Amino acid sequence: MYNASIKKPVWLAAVLYLSVLTGSALGEDVTVSYAALTAAYMDHIVAIEKGYILEEGLNVKIMRAGGGTATQTLLSGQLHFSSSAGTALSAALRGGLVKIVYTNMSRPTYRLVSNKPEIKTLQDLVGKKIAINTFGDTGHLATLLLFKKYGLDTKSFLFIAVRNEARFPAFVSGSVDAAPLSPRDIAQVGPLKGHILADTTKEVQLVWNGVAVSSKLLAENPLLVERFLRAVAKGREFARRYKEPTIAMIAKYTPTPSDVLSLDYDTVLGSMTESGWVTDDVLRDEIMTRGELIKVTKLPEAGQLFDYRIIKKVYAELKKSWKPKL
């Protein structure tokens, strides 16, 4: 059996490892990675704060790490759950023995924005420069899926990786022609009269954040996966119904002005899947697009990369007999 009380590894210097005290020294420890404890992870935050994790007999140990580090640690067997499902999917496409078991958000919260008046349509962007944060990130993938949806050759656009701190100067100066921007970004760009070419939230879906596990853990201890997902699903349903209490919980982990948290909450809410999973056609499109991006020639079937059976079971049971309460 997979040992849930795994040994604590020596993390890379950039990783902050800490325990969340869930109220019981007798609970089973599980280690979960998060790139940041923001509104995008409010399902997990509420699960911890409302005690749903503890109800399942679990104590969460939080590992703060980016998707790359988290996925490597997941593959090594030193991490139970990663919330960086997109990065884990790339690893799985390359043959890594991980599976995505839950998808919380599937609608990318980006608008493709240009501040060039002559650029009015997606077609006008052919041959133009599009600023992204990093190659293969959500903004990049969402833009690729958008172009594919409208039959545009993705090789006809010049994507330039510009780190966050340099993207706005590049956009404002006109050295790039467009960029996928979040609602928070657009609030800053607003006075600059940037205009929206497309809203990816309404146009495409992809596997954004959720939960990835090692294939070994899923095979050897599916009950542990079920307990964790049940707690997270409860946190998710509470968060969807009760905005103000949820924002207060998020603020404990990421102190941010309340108006910004409110915008983030609304943005995440609009991106959430209905019941923690996405359809096969969405999976096929993302597998193909992500595979092309990372140059995987032989693409596996969706069933080798995703297993939504547990989250579907959890949601079916919760809908019959459980409702969130303040």
Regions from the PLM with identified roles:
Residues E220-K298:
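Secondary-structure end/capping motifs
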Residues G291-L326:
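Conserved C-terminal helix/tail region of periplasmic/extracytoplasmic solute-binding proteins
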